[in-house]
Amino acid sequence: MAQKLWEKSVQVNKDIERFTVGRDREMDLYLAKHDVLGSMAHITMLESIGLLTKEELEQLLAELKTIYASVERGEFIIEEGVEDVHSQVELMLTRRLGDVGKKIHSGRSRNDQVLLDLKLFTRTQIREIAEAVEQLFHVLILQSERYKNVLMPGYTHLQIAMPSSFGLWFGAYAESLVDDMQFLQAAFRMCNRNPLGSAAGYGSSFPLNRTMTTDLLGFDSLNYNVVYAQMGRGKLERNVAFALATIAGTISKLAFDACMFNSQNFGFVKLPDDCTTGSSIMPHKKNPDVFELTRAKCNKLQSLPQQIMMIANNLPSGYFRDLQIIKEVFLPAFQELKDCLQMTTYIMNEIKVNEHILDDDKYLFIFSVEEVNRLAREGMPFRDAYKKVGLDIEAGKFTHDKQVHHTHEGSIGNLCNDEISALMQQVVDGFNFCGMEQAEKALLGR
């Protein structure tokens, strides 16, 4: 069994080891590629300040590229008795290179190493989430334009209210995603600052070149203050979780709408048959299980910031092992959200709308405000027009031609989808993922 990086003469109690390591071996597999990339940047910097020779650097880089390839193939494991990915990588280098492998940790702590790994992992995941959100956005805008002239009932308090349109419905969720992406961009900017060199949280007596590792890893800038770099652990995950939760909130609401509007009592939309499931007892059933599960998963994601907040709450400055537990709820969350986005994008692209829903007589009164506004435009005071239409409804005399005349920005007749698309493009352009992608390729020599 491998010796711990910190182990000296006293052996660790096995129950204590099991408890303290917890699920870290499992969780750290998410971080393995990023740990290798961080080490490649770190040793390149170490060679520049004379702590490694050029030959040692070349040996270490070659072995790290081999380890990186094994991660990509899904062959990398963290051995029993090894605490984490950092220890596993150093162990593999030491086995292959002897004393040269032992030099890799100079000027570094697992505290700044894991924080770096988390930032590298998270910014990659944010890029994938942003791409998935953008795909869903374009589908929603496409459907909004396709059905912009098809009316549907609008509800308040779950009561029939005013005319809406499928163009408005699809477009509303598209614009919601624009705001969500702004949250995600703020999280990305916080994530894209280099903590490496903060070591255990108080810096190092080695003359580290933190600007160099910042450039090598494609970060926008540094976490300058080494104490704050470590204080940012927990805060980083919480703020990213808020961004994920914001997107999840939009998807959850859309899923609820789709389930409700697909039901026989509404009949506004029809989900694709291949996206529904059946019943073991009722042969007629076509259940919207995909959106029900999406709703539940997204509601779970909306609890993530609170979970992280409670784990990291009331900690003073400095590193604490409490922070390890955040990985268990944080790292898997990205894939859950990506799955929900993928399912939602597919179904929204295939969904069918009922173009004749307002032919049902129960929706006649939905046009009452249209009639009030018509009378007001003809000169009747609004309140008098309101009362007249109300009395006509009570007397059973209300009629309307079921036409709407909305022209202002963002209304049925003027969706402003071009303006909404321009807003989304502005946010997308603001991410600037190119720097991180180019830096990672350069480190790997690709």
UniProtKB/Swiss-Prot annotation:
Belongs to the lyase 1 family. Argininosuccinate lyase subfamily. It comes from Bacteroides thetaiotaomicron (strain ATCC 29148 / DSM 2079 / JCM 5827 / CCUG 10774 / NCTC 10582 / VPI-5482 / E50). InterPro entries: Argininosuccinate_lyase, Fumarase/histidase_N, Fumarate_lyase_CS, Fumarate_lyase_fam, Fumarate_lyase_N, L-Aspartase-like. It holds the Pfam family Lyase_1. The keyword Amino-acid biosynthesis applies. This is Argininosuccinate lyase. SUPFAM superfamilies: L-aspartase-like. Gene3D superfamilies: Fumarase/aspartase (C-terminal domain), Fumarase/aspartase (Central domain), Fumarase/aspartase (N-terminal domain). Signal peptide: none annotated. It catalyses: 2-(N(omega)-L-arginino)succinate = fumarate + L-arginine. It is found in: Cytoplasm. Keywords: Amino-acid biosynthesis, Arginine biosynthesis, Cytoplasm, Lyase. One of its GO terms (cellular component) is cytosol. The gene is argH.
